[in-house]
Regions:
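Acidic, glycine-rich A-domain
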Residues: 1-198
Length: 198
């Protein structure tokens, strides 16, 4: 026994699955000011934490509408971007347009949100309103838009993606909006004030 040094020391090693985190931020006009800046601050904190952890891939996207079209852009992808991209470019992000919500989710799922076997997958959403978008061809609002969002959320879950969706409130928020948000995201819906996000 005295010749075995393992008697005196033990090392506990824990292994964690690789993880993929997608952060999607609503950059519609109503998010301007504190809501957007706090959402960005929160996202940056998660990106930095993931970078230190070393085994978490992070993608951050922003969504809004422009020229009568839904827009979603990937502003950071840890697989190929350095953290300096955030400090150099994110300061130019501004809010505008309306909330296309799951119209953008559908596009994201095709390229960014497919589940990866053996890895943990998470989707975090920041938003402050109900889905709304219209042009000459489509009117995306109310119950049909909510049902479409429900469908996309269910599809993500079926792909093994865990969801947390945050409704950002500031002052008075219509009860109907909160009800719609809960209808779309169910138990994954959370309500937060931007002053308490960090």
């Amino acid at each position: 026994g005295f010749d075995n040094m393992n008697v005196f020391s033990q090392v506990t090693s824990e292994r964690y699955n690789k993880a993929n985190l997608h952060i999607s931020i609503d950059a519609s006009g109503s998010m301007s000011g504190g809501k957007l800046s706090k959402s960005i601050t929160s996202a940056v904190a998660m990106v930095k934490a993931a970078d230190m952890a070393g085994n978490i891939n992070v993608v951050v996207s922003f969504r809004w509408t422009s020229d009568k079209k839904p827009v979603v852009i990937i502003c950071y992808n840890s697989r190929k971007d350095k953290l300096t991209k955030i400090t150099k470019l994110w300061k130019y992000i501004n809010a505008g347009g309306t909330t296309p919500e799951s119209l953008c989710y559908e596009a994201l799922m095709k390229k960014w949100l497919s589940g990866v076997r053996g890895e943990d997958n998470y989707f975090i959403n920041y938003s402050d309103g109900e889905p709304w978008f219209s042009n000459d061809d489509i009117y995306y609002h109310g119950n049909p838009a909510q049902k479409h969002t429900q469908k996309m959320v269910k599809m993500m879950k079926n792909n093994g993606i865990k969801i947390s969706s945050y409704f950002i409130t500031e002052g008075y928020t219509y009860r109907d909006s909160k009800g719609s948000f809960t209808k779309m995201y169910g138990r994954d819906a959370n309500f937060i004030d931007p002053t308490n996000m960090m």
